[in-house]
């Protein structure tokens, strides 16, 4: 069995519209051709352009459509084949189905605690307060949520949470959520354009009013002229060698585009390394870093080192395997580094002590995946190691509106920073997409001026368009000796070596030096093929990844403490003076980093923080 790819079979499985319906919807935004030297490009004029077709982008588009606005959603892959589908274990909402004492204030308090209080408190409270309604909405739209015997929406344990609040569909929750959102979007006839890669936002220095890109199948250039642009294109975990994303997603597209357009980025030094990624040397390199859902531990899975010791008893005797992800990931990393890992460079995750039928019911995708690799997880352990999984840092926004500070540009989902602080609570990523996605959609609909978008490009926009297409054409014609994929691999190795789970000043500075050398090698880039080739896509990804990786290294060097997912071995303690966000902007071609104070939670959430809740996970034994 191979990892899922971006084939049409998977797209149909996830609810891709029929060709007839898709064609009818697409007619709303006709292409007009215009010359750029010898190139031809299409001009598409939706009032709102949503860049990114995962759960966040879909939820924004649904809200816009329900408000009478005609958005256009574009994605890099086939319709339905977004990174959301890899979020397996669940989505948080304080429903109290099993633990009636749970409520949104405790959800918010847990989120702030696990974010080490670098979160935007308002963003946290908006998410926690919205989620019960958003889950019930998804349920009404047909999401096949697991139920208790008495018909309530079921909830499971996830790490570092005071109560059982993670709603789920087996171990395919993200896939089920995206299917549901796509179905709802299709009911509203939301237009969608697949296999489009955006390379630049249309900006005159004061306002963003569209984007430039190309169709990855035909190579044709595309200009999107819009009143408002929403970035919902994910994070940048794929700048690491071991990552849970696919190689052509989460390369930092959205963050690099926003930075170039004048927006600020926040907290890029915080990258979540999920404790349990697959070990490539054991299962095949194509599986290296792929996620083993936290639901395995949530259902009672235990971690053992090669000596047979259940080592989390030493690191976290109370919460054990269900401590926060940063704690468990560092513990696994330490076991491997100290020589107690397996021969393949991992540790063992074992759920074979649970009833086999129960495991098959609750974790069907994990059972199927490992069976295809000759492993029965109901009978034997699997081998896991940390993997770059999620980026807490991203675009700096006002969460009430999605505004970035650049007129016409909004952002949402993993693209942004603020909800998760220094470490993300499992189950909160899917929660943020729909909770904040709805709010952003509402605001953009309210902000949209009446009338259609002017299909004519301004002189400034036309100049930006021409420069960008000429740059893309030059990139496609590059005939040097270094393949883009080679440099991408070198960058990912660099980031794993110098900015991974454990960091120090020397490693970070060495990483910046190696990155500068990589930039110099791009002068000898050779792209095999035209704009329809994977080599060309890798070259574009490389440009985004270099920008974001350099920014992340600089911010990690700036933060001289350890907090959450950012662990400096030369500054191993958390420093109360560093309870501050780092904000970066591009000024005259240079990165400018500044500090910004963190807000305080509301009185009700502060009371929940002071109360303190701690669940005894030992009943899972």
Over which residues does each language-model region extend?
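Glycine-rich Rossmann-fold phosphate-binding loop(s) that bind the pyrophosphate
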Residues: 52-54
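Short beta-strand "acidic-cap" motif of Rossmann-like dinucleotide-binding folds
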Residues: 70-75, 267
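Conserved N-terminal glycine-rich FAD pyrophosphate-binding loop of Rossmann-like flavoproteins
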Residues: 77-110, 116, 276, 283-288
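An anion/pyrophosphate-binding glycine-rich loop and adjacent beta-alpha core
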Residues: 257, 263-376, 380, 443-450
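N-terminal Rossmann-fold NAD(P) dinucleotide-binding loop
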Residues: 57
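Conserved redox-cofactor binding core of oxidoreductases
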Residues: 134, 140-220, 232, 274-283
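Glycine- and aromatic-enriched mobile tails/lids
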Residues: 10, 19, 25-46, 60-63, ...
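Core beta-strand elements of the Rossmann-like FAD/NAD(P) dinucleotide-binding domain
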Residues: 43-46, 218-228, 405-406
């Amino acid at each position: 069995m191979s990892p899922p790819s971006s084939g049409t079979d998977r797209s149909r499985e996830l609810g891709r519209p029929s060709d007839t319906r898709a064609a009818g919807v697409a007619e709303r935004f006709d292409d007009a051709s215009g010359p750029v030297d010898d190139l031809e490009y299409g001009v598409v004029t939706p009032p709102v352009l949503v860049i990114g077709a995962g759960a966040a982008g879909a939820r924004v588009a649904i809200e816009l459509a329900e408000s009478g606005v005609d958005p256009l959603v574009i994605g890099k892959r086939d319709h339905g084949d977004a990174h959301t589908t890899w979020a397996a274990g669940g989505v948080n909402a304080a429903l109290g189905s099993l633990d009636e004492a749970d409520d949104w204030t405790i959800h918010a308090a847990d989120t702030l605690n696990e974010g080490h209080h670098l979160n935007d408190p308002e963003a946290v409270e908006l998410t926690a307060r919205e989620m019960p309604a958003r889950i019930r909405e998804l349920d009404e739209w047909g999401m096949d949520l697991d139920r208790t015997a008495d018909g309530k929406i079921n909830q499971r344990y996830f790490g570092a949470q005071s109560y059982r609040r993670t709603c789920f569909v087996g171990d395919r929750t993200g896939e089920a959520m995206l299917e549901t959102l796509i179905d709802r979007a299709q009911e509203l006839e939301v237009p969608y354009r697949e296999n489009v890669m955006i390379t630049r936002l249309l900006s005159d220095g004061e306002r963003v009013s569209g984007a430039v890109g190309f169709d990855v199948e035909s190579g044709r250039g595309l200009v999107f002229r819009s009143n408002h642009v929403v970035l919902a294109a994910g994070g940048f975990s794929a700048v690491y060698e071991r990552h849970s994303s696919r190689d052509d997603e989460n390369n930092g597209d959205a963050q690099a585009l926003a930075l170039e357009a004048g927006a600020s980025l926040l907290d890029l030094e915080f990258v979540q390394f999920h404790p349990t990624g697959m070990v490539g040397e054991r299962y095949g390199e194509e599986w290296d870093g792929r996620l083993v859902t936290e639901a395995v531990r949530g259902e009672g899975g235990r971690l053992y080192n090669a000596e047979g010791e259940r080592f989390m008893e030493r690191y976290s005797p109370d919460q054990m395997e269900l401590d926060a992800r940063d704690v468990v990931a560092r513990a696994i990393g330490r076991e491997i580094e100290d020589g107690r890992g397996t021969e393949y460079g991992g540790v063992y995750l074992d759920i074979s002590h649970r009833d086999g039928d129960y495991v098959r019911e609750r974790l069907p995708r994990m059972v199927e995946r490992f069976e295809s690799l000759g492993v029965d997880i109901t009978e034997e352990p699997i081998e896991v190691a940390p993997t770059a999984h999620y980026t807490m840092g991203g675009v700096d926004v006002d969460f009430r509106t999605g505004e970035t500070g650049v007129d016409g540009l909004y952002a949402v989902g993993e693209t942004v920073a603020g909800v998760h602080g220094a470490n993300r609570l499992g189950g909160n990523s899917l929660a943020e997409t729909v909770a904040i996605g709805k709010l952003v959609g509402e605001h953009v609909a309210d902000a949209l001026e009446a009338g259609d978008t002017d299909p004519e490009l301004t002189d400034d926009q036309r100049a930006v368009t021409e420069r960008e297409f000429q740059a893309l054409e030059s990139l496609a014609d590059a005939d040097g000796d270094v393949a883009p994929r080679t440099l991408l691999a070198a960058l990912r190795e660099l980031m794993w070596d110098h900015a991974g789970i454990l960091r120090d000043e020397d490693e970070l500075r060495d990483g910046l030096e190696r990155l500068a050398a990589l930039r110099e090698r791009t002068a000898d880039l050779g792209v095999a093929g035209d704009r329809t080739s994977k080599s060309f896509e890798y070259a574009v990804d490389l440009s985004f990844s270099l920008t974001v990786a350099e920014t992340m290294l600089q911010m990690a060097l700036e933060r001289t403490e350890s907090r959450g997912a950012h662990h400096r071995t030369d500054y191993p303690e958390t420093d109360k003076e560093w309870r501050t966000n780092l904000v970066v902007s591009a000024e005259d071609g240079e990165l400018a980093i500044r500090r910004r104070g963190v807000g305080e939670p509301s009185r009700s959430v502060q009371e929940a923080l002071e109360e303190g809740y701690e669940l005894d996970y030992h009943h899972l034994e």
